[in-house]
């Protein structure tokens, strides 16, 4: 079946190339409604505005077709005990090497994870210190502003008190002068 499919693909390639070549030699379309090959036949059904339609008829494979050949594997030679031992040792070395490589990879991965965690802790500590410093600075600024506002308020109250005392004194002087 696979051989038939391959032959079909090849014939279709040839068909399109044949059509191309024919159109070069014969600019006017030829009236070839049937193309015949060894194991297939192509009939043109009708022409359409969107393209052409074909009917493809595959002939059954001939009874003399070649049976799929299986390649015989080369005969294995007998291995000696030394050769078997060498192969086993080589396999053991490969296994150990692969194991060492996996362990190395895991160690590198753990080291990377440790570095990432260390960096995250440092950044967190730096952020905490910066936030604490900003908070202390802000609290100091708020305290200074509060003290300045209180001093200004006390100054205004003292000024009002002096003014009130002066007004009382002036009133007493007026009462004494008028009385």
UniProtKB/Swiss-Prot annotation:
Residues the record lists as Phosphoserine modifications: 16, 50, 62, 73, 80, 97
Region annotation (Regulatory/phosphorylation domain) ranges: 39-96
Domain of life, source organism: Eukaryota
Tissue: Expression is neuron-specific and found in cerebellum, forebrain, midbrain, tectum and spinal cord.
Predominant location category: cytoplasm
Protein name per UniProt: Stathmin-2
GO cellular component terms attached to this protein's record: cytoplasm; growth cone; lamellipodium; membrane; neuron projection; neuronal cell body; perinuclear region of cytoplasm
Coiled-coil ranges (or none): 74-179
Subcellular location: Cytoplasm; Cytoplasm, Perinuclear region; Cell projection, Growth cone; Membrane
Entry keywords, A to Z: Cell projection, Coiled coil, Cytoplasm, Membrane, Phosphoprotein
